[in-house]
Structure formats: structure tokens, C-alpha cells
Amino acid sequence: MLVKIYTDGAARGNPDGPGGYGCVLEYVDTKGELHVKEISQGYVRTTNNRMELMAVIAGLEALNRPCTVEVYSDSQYVVNAFNQHWVDGWLKKGWKRGKNEPVKNVDLWKRLLSAKGKHNVTFHWVKGHDGQPQNERCAELA
């Protein structure tokens, strides 16, 4: 089954201000009927990047069986981590980045990899606040 997950995260006073995430999951069943699920949550102290990660995690963790998943995000941080193979490099270096610095948000990256594991996931960057209905809805939820 193909599931499309649209995500967005936001934080005010970044870092350590209030924030939240939103995600919209869509799939079409065998009868051709569209199903939509919305997920969102807020936090008192967080960062924008943590909320971007949580949006993807929440979407993937909501799936109850292995799926083909297309993730649509305006976060280059999340999309490039997979499409430019940053995560592969971090894993090889023991969760270190260039100059041997620790990867930020490693707790959420590990959780995302675990949630992603049983699915065939592709990541797509979309321009934020550009009128794409699902992503605009995610921004509202966040």
C-alpha cells in the first residue's frame, strides 16, 4: 500500500521556545476510497528541527503494517539527511558529523530510523508555505 505523509514542524523562540508538529497521512484503499489521518502535538520547549523530525516519526509510527511511503517535507534538514546520505555517514562515524562533532537530535534520528525500518520510504522536499494544501494543513496543525 502507498501512503503519502505530509509533515511540518515549527517552534517560536527557536531554540527552546514552544513548538509543535503536524502531519497528514493519505492512502487510497482497494476500493479507491481516500483515507486521511491528521496527527499533531505541541511542546513547551523545543526546536524547529526537533518538531520537523517528530512530524515524520509520528506519521511513520502511525502505520500498522509495512508500506511504501512517500514523505513530503519542507525541511531540508530531514530530506537531505536521507537523500544526501548524511545519516549513512553519521552511522559510520558513530553519530558524529564533520570535525568529529556529535549529531544533534540523535535521540530522534534513532527513533526515526527505527520507525522507518519496516517501510520502503522516499523523502521529497517541497517548498514551504507555497499553497500545497496538505503541507499548508500541516503548518496549521503545527
Language-model features and meaning:
Residues 10-16, 57-141:
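RNase H catalytic domain
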Residues 1-50, 54, 61-67, 82, ...:
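RNase H-like nuclease fold core
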